[in-house]
A protein has these predicted regions:
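Internal helix-turn-beta structural module
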Residues: 127, 131-151, 161-230
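A mobile "lid/hinge" subdomain adjacent to the ATP/sugar-phosphate binding pocket shared
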Residues: 86-129
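Conserved active-site and cofactor/substrate-binding residues in soluble primary-metabolism enzymes
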Residues: 9, 13, 17, 42, ...
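Alpha-helical scaffold segments in soluble metabolic enzymes
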Residues: 17-25, 78-82, 92-96, 143, ...
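Catalytic phosphate/nucleotide-handling subdomain of diverse soluble enzymes
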Residues: 48, 54-86, 95, 158-189
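Glycine-rich phosphate-binding loop of actin/hexokinase-like ATP-binding domains
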Residues: 1-83
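Beta-strand segments within the central parallel beta-sheet cores of soluble alpha/beta enzyme folds
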Residues: 32-36, 91-99, 153-155
């Protein structure tokens, strides 16, 4: 509190938009949902009863999932190791974690399409990076399912989440113990609207929902303006 350090979270408008769409589809407010925003920046949110209760990003947009150029979760002692043993400055370490890590650091590419293309050609670094990316997402799915004591749906959104059937399949593989069963045929889509890509037998719905952050921002502004008008009218009545 003294230094104004807190958990901020990021991609909030995206998570809010798709979670509300998911709740509307499920038809119940008291739901347990994990929203997975996968783009060049990536984040996940655990949403219980319509409220965010945990998020992979915090004070900065660096931690959590492996991203295009950002590291995601690391052992914090690496920072001190780089500074003490290799004389990295704080600015150099910050640049390394923000701009030269993640998929770029693992493969030399920051664009998932390039990484997938290289993996298909047999590039071992790219194959490993795709496995690592899915593994990290799975860890958070398991963690969030535990803290919410169950799961009703997981939602994929943003550039990669909406447009990469391969990444969705990698993430959902071997999660049947949680009740997550992906339909391989349904998953071969890049939808322009809410689409269910899980099987009928899947207890947990797997949804792909195109995000619309601009619309969510407009809705928030209109809501804020309505509240201001209500307050103004109440004051005028006084």
């Amino acid at each position: 509190e003294k230094h104004n350090i807190r958990l901020y979270g990021f991609h909030g408008t995206s998570h809010k938009y798709v979670s509300e769409k998911a709740i509307e589809y499920l038809g119940k407010q008291n739901s347990k949902i994990i929203t997975i925003h996968l783009g060049n920046g990536c984040s996940m949110t655990a949403i219980k009863n319509g409220k965010s209760i945990d998020h992979t990003l915090g004070f900065s947009p660096v931690n959590g999932l492996i991203m295009g150029t950002r590291s995601g979760d690391i052992d914090q002692s690496i920072i001190f190791h780089l500074a003490k043993k290799f004389n990295y400055s704080l600015d150099e370490i910050n640049s390394l974690l923000q701009n030269k890590s993640g998929m770029l650091g693992l493969t030399g590419f920051s664009d998932l399409r390039d990484i997938q293309a290289e993996a298909e050609k047999g590039n071992k670094d790219c194959k490993l990076a795709l496995q690592m990316n899915a593994y990290r997402i799975k860890k958070y799915i398991g963690s969030y399912a535990a803290i919410m004591n169950g799961l009703d749906a997981i939602v994929f959104t943003a550039g990669i989440g909406e447009n990469s059937p391969d990444m969705r399949q990698r993430v959902c593989e071997d999660l049947d113990y949680l009740g997550i069963i992906l339909d391989i045929n349904k998953n071969q889509v890049r939808p322009d609207k809410l689409t269910v890509v899980s099987t009928d037998a899947s207890k947990v719905k797997v949804l792909v929902i195109p995000t619309n952050e601009e619309l969510e921002i407009i809705k928030d502004k209109l809501s804020a303006r309505s509240i201001e008008n209500l307050v103004k009218n109440d004051k005028e009545k006084e």
